Amino acid sequence: MKPAFASLVQKDGVRILDGKKVVMELWFREAAPTGPKNTEDAISLTGIPHGSYVGIARFPERGSDRRGQSIKAGVYTLRLSFFPPNGDHQGVSPQRDFFVVSPASDDVDAGTALAFEPLVALSRKASGTPHPLVLSVWKTDGEGKSGLAQDGEHDTVLHSKIGSIPITLIVAGKFDH
């Protein structure tokens, strides 16, 4: 991981286990990036600018996103994005927030928020498909407890924080599309 990215995350990450096997490790930013409040519909993380670097993910072995796309073993950056309100994503989730997963080796500037198209292009390098790798996320109301929980029939979520902002992130699950 490039020092400019690693220096911004919390020292203690989170390990997601399946039994005793580590399937994912996550480190979120110590302080959340800030910007003008986003007033678009169905956005929960309104104070974090689109395309901002929010954390690091490491997959020690092959994993997958909620769409079933394969994620190769490796280290990735996480950046916040919002799926476009063009009708292609109806029923995916009540909120439009998600983390775009991109190869850490190809992400160049932790301090620059990426526009939608360059961000999607960067993630396509990881997915090898026309669709970026994504992890669904939303702001949690109140303080909430940190840790893993079951959400509905198919999803396992992580309750954590980016800086002081409480979030819920789907770390395992499947969306039937």
Residue ranges and their predicted role:
Residues 39-44, 53-62:
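N-terminal post-signal-peptidase region of extra-cytosolic proteins
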Residues 47, 88-91:
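Short consensus segments that form the blades of beta-propeller domains
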Residues 65:
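Short, acidic, Ser/Thr-enriched surface-loop or helix-capping motifs
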Residues 74-81:
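A short tyrosine-centered beta-strand micro-motif
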